[in-house]
Amino acid sequence: MDVEMRKVKFSEYFKNRIKDIPFAVMCALYMAFCVGCMIYSAVELGARDALLAVVYMIFIPAVFVFEYLIGFRVGYILTVLIIFSACGGLLGSSYNIYMILPWFDSLLHAVSGILFFAAGFMLAEVFFGKDNVNKHFFGKLAFAIFFSTTVGVAWEFFEYLISETMGFDMLEDAMVTDIQSYLLSQSHNVAIELNDITQTVITYDGGKEEWVINGGYMDLGLYDTLNDLLIAAAGTVSIAIVSIISFYKFPKFNKMFIPELVNNRRKPIEATASAADTAETAEAVDDGVAKESDNLSDSVSDNVSDTVKDND
């Protein structure tokens, strides 16, 4: 007999989810960090950075919403990576960490490749199902790799659009000392090479103002975009290799890292007292009918036997 199920309300799911103490503590610390950044930014830095802190606060509620809608559970490893990536993005954008630690942006993009690989693998489990895990593992792996690289490209599109439409410089500039350009020669057959560039002079405002850049020629985001894509792809491929090794040698790691599909949105409906009473009554009636039928059958059998004896 099929058990009737009911949909779990988001509030009920949320209450059960935060009973996971380590997960709840990590989420609470992250939210406190964002609130602190928002207050500090509003007082010391300006409205832009305060708004950015508010935007980053959405990350944790988004995790709860996606968990509930899709039906998966984020493990501790992935939670730490999500929080690290979000905190790093906020610190880099508002507190000049990208300038203090030039390699920090590359680290965040490598982590993003790992995160989106995990998300892609989880979505593959939604599509392929959790059955026959060994059979579909490499199909899920390929899907996760393609998903992660696609999201990486989409993110670079997003950075470009924000930079062009809202005036945020999301494309990090780079200083280069050597360039090759067809534009300088006005021909696609000959590329002009400029080597050992030490200074760039920019004349602007109709020739009234001049800005001198020492140290080379400033590239406006091309190197940053390609470097971000390569680093994210490297992070994706690295975690894919780790997942393959874990699949054969350490399967517990994949279970800890990949979001787990769980049935957290539906639960059995408990029988009410009236329903239970109805069931018991129906069962009693069935038993009574069966006993009455047996008694009638025995009576008929006895009558037939007596008739046969009298005839004899």
Identify the meaning behind each predicted range.
Residues 253-277:
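Short, highly charged, low-complexity non-transmembrane loops/tails of multi-pass membrane proteins
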Residues 32-38, 83-95, 149-153:
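Aromatic-anchored segments of alpha-helical transmembrane domains
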Residues 109-117, 143, 147-193, 200, ...:
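Alpha-helical transmembrane segments that form the membrane-embedded catalytic/substrate-binding core
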Residues 42-47, 94-104:
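Membrane-interface helix caps and helix-loop-helix hairpins in membrane proteins
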Residues 38-51, 63-72:
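Short, hydrophobic transmembrane alpha-helix segments
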Residues 73-84, 106-108:
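Cytoplasmic-side transmembrane-helix entry/capping segments in multi-pass membrane proteins
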Residues 16, 66-77, 130-136:
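Membrane-interface helix-boundary motifs at transmembrane edges
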Residues 1-17:
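Short, Lys/Arg-rich, polar N-terminal cytosolic tail immediately upstream
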